[in-house]
C-alpha cells in the first residue's frame, strides 16, 4: 500500500511542486535576506535596530495568518491591491496573481528571509574590520574587497541560512494549502 501511494502520479507531481516552490523560495529569501543584512550592518541607515526587530515579526506569527493577509491583499479578483489598480488606473485584469508558483514563493520569501538575515547579520558584525582596512591600504577597491574578503567570509552563513530555508520550505504546508489548492498546486 505504501509503495502504491509513492508511485502514484499525484504524489510525484506534489514532490515536483514542493521542489519548485522550495527552490524559488530559497533563492528569493537568500537574496532578500543577504541584501537587508548588508544594508543594516554596512550602511548608516537610520532605525537599524527597528528594522532588525521588524524582520523578526514573522517568527512570532503562524505562517497561515500572514498567508491569509496576503491573500486578502493580492487575490486576483477580490484583493484590495488588485482592486485599487483596476479602479484607479483602469487595468483590464489583475496586476498580481498570488495563486501561482511565483505568488506562493513570494509569500514564503516574506516569511522566511529572516533566517538568512539573522545569520548574515551575525557574520557581517563579527567580521574583523582590520581585514577591510588592510585591503584598502593595499590599494584594493570596494568591488575587490567584497569579492575577495567579504563574500568568502560570509558565504558559510549565507549557505547555512539557505539550507534552513530549503528544508523549512519543503516542510511548509500551510502557505501552499491556502494559496495553491485553487490552482491545483499541491505539495508534500
Predicted region positions:
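Membrane-water interface segments at the C-terminal ends of transmembrane alpha-helices
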Residues: 1, 7-125, 153-174, 178
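Short hydrophobic, aromatic-rich alpha-helical segments embedded in or entering the lipid bilayer
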Residues: 1-4, 183-188
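Membrane-helix boundary and inter-helical linker elements of multi-pass secondary transporters
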Residues: 41, 137-138
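Short coil/turn motifs that cap or connect alpha-helices
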Residues: 46, 140-141
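Helix-turn-helix DNA-binding elements, focusing on the entry/boundary residues of the two helices
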Residues: 131
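Glycine/proline-centered hinge or cleavage motifs at structural transition points of membrane proteins
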Residues: 138-139, 152
